[in-house]
Amino acid sequence: MRTKKLPALRVGVGGPVGSGKTTLLEMLCKAMRERYDLVAITNDIYTKEDQRLLTISGALPAERIMGVETGGCPHTAIREDASINLEAVDRMLAKFPDADVVFIESGGDNLAATFSPELSDLTIYVIDVAGGEKIPRKGGPGITKSDLLIINKTDLAPYVGASLEVMESDTRKMRGDRPFVMCNLRAQGGLDEVIRFIERQGMLAA
């Protein structure tokens, strides 16, 4: 727990469709909810499917999860015109003023997606092995500039002909000293490392 009250930490989670963003949010919420006061905001273009999935998974009580329909390019709603998400954050913090963390999941987007610094204090970008071992070296702000990069679904590497060693090497070249984690989120592989990063960088831990 935090030793003193600070403004809620806003953690943006981005990445392509199907990379594991909603799974990451579910796992983070279930692992952290006993220690921290959490709320979550999900973005979808025309539905609130990710909100529904988070709710039925029991990640958080339904009133602590808000779905936002962006109605257009999901990148715009987290970067160029983040007003719809900034309003959602304000509404959630009005309901839960003691929240320690606000998770904000972007809609699925391409490698160019980034969060506005107005919206997110920490950015986590999720890619997955099933997209091919070439993904890290394609670059883009999500891969090169995010605070933490997650390479998810490492268990699928043998089935898609991807080399985890090549992906790790390419990621180091693209990110320099910026951290990344190899994960199998469905089995909670790498989850503890992600939580430690959030606690350390977000100044949550005592």
Swiss-Prot record:
It comes from the Bacteria. GTP binds at residues 15-22. Keywords: Chaperone, Cytoplasm, GTP-binding, Nickel insertion, Nucleotide-binding. It holds the Pfam family cobW. GO terms for cellular component: cytoplasm. InterPro entries: CobW/HypB/UreG_nucleotide-bd, P-loop_NTPase, UreG. It is found in: Cytoplasm. Its main location: cytoplasm. One of its GO terms (molecular function) is GTPase activity. One of its GO terms (biological process) is urea catabolic process. Belongs to the SIMIBI class G3E GTPase family. UreG subfamily. Homodimer. UreD, UreF and UreG form a complex that acts as a GTP-hydrolysis-dependent molecular chaperone, activating the urease apoprotein by helping to assemble the nickel containing metallocenter of UreC. The UreE protein probably delivers the nickel. HAMAP family: UreG (MF_01389). Facilitates the functional incorporation of the urease nickel metallocenter. This process requires GTP hydrolysis, probably effectuated by UreG. This is Urease accessory protein UreG. The gene is ureG.
